[in-house]
């Protein structure tokens, strides 16, 4: 089926990832995947990091779980890593960092390769997850593609979310979430409580 045959090809084509079918979940658009992340990780007053500004739909999804937000400014080459380090030193129990690294919504900025690597290093040092929301990746018309953060990840710290809504058709409402197998088991339990779509 789609889960077994098509998804590994899709992840390889779009993100350069060698992910098995057991690491990918189909969702009803990227928004459902974002909400599933909130359900999986957040309790009231948990600390998370978002870019400032960021995608409003993500904030609306996370708001349901009443987290404490820490905002990191976005520079011309992506998230301000120095500012993020200050937050992590003050709040080392951050649950995750939510980022839109490719053509960031709403700024349109793409995170540099150096900053992607630095963000991953911090995730390993402070033991938090990176939520890489990347629905705009293939809207690039000039310049070289920057490797996805998930492609750079060797320690299972990245949860990659994407969808067809921006590159094919919003009406499809088809997205996907890629994570390590342990997290996928958790997300499958959550999704089974939300709908019966395989």
List the predicted regions and their residue ranges.
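Glycine-centered flexible beta-alpha turn that most often forms the glycine-rich phosphate-binding loop
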Residues: 133
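Single conserved hydrophobic/aromatic residue that forms the stacking wall/gate
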Residues: 1-5
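Conserved core segment of the aminotransferase class I/II
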Residues: 154-198
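Short, Asp-centered acidic motifs that coordinate Mg2+ and/or phosphate
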Residues: 94-96, 128-129, 159, 174
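Conserved core of the PLP fold type I
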Residues: 6-126, 137-139, 144-155
